[in-house]
Every structure is written in structure tokens, then in C-alpha cells.
Amino acid sequence: MSDMSANEQEEGVMEASPQGGERTTKDLGIARPLRLNSGLLLGNRLAKAAMTEGLADRRGWPGPRLERLYERWARGGVGLVITGNAMVDGRYLERAGNVIIEDAGVHEALSAWSAAARKGCAALVQLSHPGRQTNRFICGQPLAPSEGPPVKVMASFSRPRAMTPLEVEATVERFVFAADACRRAGFDGVQIHAAHGYLLAQFLSPLTNRRADVWGGSLENRARLLLEIVRAVRARTGAGFTLAVKINSADFQKGGFSEEDSLEVVRWLDAEGIDLLEISGGNYESPALLLGPGLRESTVAREAYFLEFARRVRGVTRLPLMVTGGFRSAAAMEAALGEDALDLVGLARPLALDPDFPARLLSGEVERSEVQPLRVKGKALGMLAEASWFGDQMDRIADGLDPDPGISPYGSIARYLTWQTARGLRHRATYRPPQTVQRG
């Protein structure tokens, strides 16, 4: 949590802005504290959004590199950090090097990570299951709501099989165990990842969920897994442990999860009493967050990719709302907060290149991030370049170095593919699940 006391932070909200003269920090909407329904107080309206790190050790446990990375971000001025997606099932990873939370052995390492991530801000762990978006080096046959074609990205994925009802129910238990493990380790809460085409988003989409049982068919049935996880996590961890959900505004695929679907799921999440909702969009086959969801020039100029949908969300809920994607300037952040379109600004890539950007923004030292899209030809290669190049920057911070904007994106791609292939195959060959699957 912040070094400033809760009373001092909340008093800062109530102080009147000075008349005339230079703008002070207290004039900024992004500098105002935010208290969530769980009671968690965020020191300001800037959040480090989840980015996949791939920095866990061979067991899938966090270690010194993740501790260094998150302590740097925690001291960089944000009110909240959200970790990259920690896996609830070690058989199925989003990438090699994911943190895995599936047995009690991880507790000490998880506690050390929590202590580092909370030095100056609040910290949530993002919990996820990749489903069909598990690459073929890690798993020869990934899981999905229904059998279907593999993810169509660079021949990196295998054809998934449909989950059995028992596997679906066990997934609820895995999320509950992981959430409670994070609570016991000292984290302030968790974020359930139901966006970007991972398993919970696959259940929400009629394109990937064609089940004929209680887990498929109607939107209510397709949302059942997400809602059961939310209820079970809340029952296990209690009202004082922050429970957030990340959801797509849409998956931007014809016949897929639509904005109207998303608004209905938001209503249900509101009824469940979650503490924070984050809006994003897309999946591996339609990566809106990385490449933009067919963005109009006005959207790019406004910076926030999903702001129009956020306004629609405001019409159905007053849940604290975080929007991630495209924010670069203080002016755009202030405008979005000023019109009450959101409560929390999510920042990802700017913090990989400049971990102190929030503090410099709040102090007035800078007005915007200098992060620019990488210029690499081809949609798939461009997506890979973005992931690998910014991953290289996080690697440097984790090693105690400063980011290096001069790194070649093509070199990053080569390193990423070599490393992911080798480590993915090693994980596949050596991973052994816990003898007893932990239950929530």
C-alpha cells in the first residue's frame, strides 16, 4: 500500500484546487485516490495493467526477477499494479515462464512477490486459464469449451478437445484455490481474466462454446463458469479481499461475443458485487489491444480504444471501471476521468519502457508517454514483435537494468521464439502435476 496514510490520501480529494497559478498535483484527476467497495484504497487513478512476463522459475514460482520488476513498478507512482496472468493449472500455460498457483508449495515465493509488489501501492494477481490458447510446444492437446479448429496464428497451436463437465467444475476449484493462496500470501486481491480469448472468454463466445449442457447455449449458460468462479472466490476469500474481473467489450469476430453480450454479463457481475471491472477487447485471432480494433482516426486521437464502450457500461452499472488500451497523454486521461467515463486508467506498454512514467506524469515532469507502435510488416509478425520487444524491456528491468528503446524488434522476435520453444518443450517434458489437486 501507499506510504501515505489513508486519511491523508482521502483528505487530498476534498481540498479545493488553488485559484490561478500553476497547476498542482492535486488539480489532476489522475492524482485523486479511489476507494473500492472492498475497502481497498488506491493512492491515485493510474494502474499498471497486466502484461505477460514469463519470468517464473522452472517450477512456475515467482522469484527475485519478478520481485525486482514489480518493486520497480510499485515505486514508480501507480496506485495499483496487476500482475501478468498467473496460471491456475500447470498443464496449460499461456506461455513458458508463467507463474503457476496450484499447490501450497508456492506460498513462500508468492509471499515474497507480494511484499515487493506492494511497496508503495496496492497489488492484485491476475488469474487465468488459457484454454485453446495454449501453444503446441507446451501442450499437444489444449482444452476448450468445445472441440474445434486450432487458433490460427503462425501454426503455433494444436486442435483443442472439449472439456468434460468434471473438468469444468474442477476449473472453478482451481481458481478458488489460487485466489485464496494469493490472499494468504498478502496480495490485496485478484483479477479474474475473462478477456483476450482465454478460457473464460472462450466460454462466453458462441464461436468457441457450442456445448449443449448447462455450460453452453444461451448467454446465461455461457457466462455460468465465470459467475460461478466469482461466487466461489468471494465465498472463500471474503468481502475485504478485492475481486476484480477483466472482460472484453467484444471479441471483434463475426458471430462472436458482442457488445450487447458484454453489457449483459456486466449487469450480472454487478449483481455479484465485484469490486472492479476492467474493459479490454480482442483475442489472439483478432488482437484489438495490440493492433487496434479497426480503429477510427478519432479513436486513435482520443487514445482510449474502448472508451465508447465504457460510456455504455456506465449506463448499466456504477462499478469502479478501469479502461486499458491506448492511453498515452495526461490530457487524454484527464478528459476520460473528467467526463466520468472511467475511474481508473490502465497503462501497460508505457510502463515497460518507462517504469517511472506515472510518477513523472503526476509531478508534471512529462505530459505523455513516448511509446510508439513498432514498425514491423505483417499482422501476425507485428503482434509477435510487440509482445517480444516489450518483453525484452521487462527482462531488463527484472535484471536490474534500465529499458533499452534501441533493441531491434526482429532480434526480440528471434530471442522470444527460441526461448519459448525450448522452455515450452522442457516444461512439457518435465512438468508433473501435484499428486493431490488442491481444492478451494
Which residues does each PLM region occupy?
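Flavin-dependent oxidoreductase catalytic cores
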Residues: 2-440
